[in-house]
């Protein structure tokens, strides 16, 4: 069982653009990556909603104002894509307060802090090879929230080419040797998403 589940509002149909193939189940539509499961619940969330659940963490646990969702059972044999969730972005007005909450709830310590101008970023990894929780402190943020996610895929070039003007022109990522492309809002994914090379 993948240790992180992301619950997404709106329709799963446009997510083929990101290299995912959501499959129907009693719980809703599911798409499995190598390190996480994405869920479009049968009791549909509003478009733009993003929730997170962790294996072993009780539903309702307080992640500095973010309420953790219930971790659900997924069917055996769920086909997994060769993509992975590189990181999930949490926005906050106080980096260390939020990072302390992440550590307390998940048991995953703060690995490092990066400062870029007035923006500070803290990084936690959920399990070996797992999802990175990137906590971003910005002056214009008033409360902690889940913002969006980045999907790393070996099919990056093919997906970007197929998506055409639904994604931005690829550019160099912060990590040396990697490239990133942002999925535009008109693609209909409902939440901020970027694609990245592995």
Please provide the spans of the model-predicted regions.
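Glyoxalase I/VOC metalloenzyme domain signal
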Residues: 1-110, 125-198
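Aromatic/basic-lined ligand-recognition segments
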Residues: 122
């Amino acid at each position: 069982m993948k240790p992180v589940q992301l619950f997404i509002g709106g329709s799963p149909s446009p997510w083929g653009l990101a290299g995912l193939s959501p499959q129907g189940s009693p719980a809703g539509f599911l798409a499995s990556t190598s390190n996480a499961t994405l869920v479009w619940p049968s009791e549909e969330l509003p478009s733009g909603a993003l929730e997170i659940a962790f294996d072993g963490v009780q539903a309702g646990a307080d992640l500095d104002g973010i309420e953790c969702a219930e971790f659900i059972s997924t069917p055996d044999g769920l086909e997994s894509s060769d993509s992975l969730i590189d990181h999930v972005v949490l926005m906050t007005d106080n980096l260390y307060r939020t990072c302390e909450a992440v550590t307390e709830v998940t048991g995953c310590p703060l690995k490092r802090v990066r400062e870029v101008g007035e923006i500070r970023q803290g990084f936690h990894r959920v399990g070996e090879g797992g999802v990175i929780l990137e906590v971003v402190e910005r002056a214009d943020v008033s409360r902690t929230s889940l913002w969006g996610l980045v999907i790393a895929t070996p099919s990056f070039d093919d997906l970007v080419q197929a998506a055409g003007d639904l994604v931005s022109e690829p550019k160099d990522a912060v990590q040396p040797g990697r490239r990133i492309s942002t999925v535009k809002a008109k693609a209909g994914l409902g939440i901020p998403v970027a694609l990245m090379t592995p």
